[in-house]
Amino acid sequence: MAIRISRHAQKQMKWRQITEAEAESTIAEPDMQQDSIKGRKNAFKTLGGRLIKVTYCREGDDIVIVTAVIKRK
């Protein structure tokens, strides 16, 4: 299983200073998870005092990160 990051997510992660490791950790071990639109999932995790939300979907055996944001608690 590979994790790929969409171009949109790459831009958002760079702008919001979310590392790939933080995004992958959020997906692998979320504090909370919920269904989203179009068969996507939202994973939430608090890391370094920030609540990170990663939206992702499955494409075959791969996981594709659609976007990542910092949420207010």
Predicted regions mapped to residue ranges:
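Ribonuclease/tRNase effector modules and their secretory precursors
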Residues: 1-73
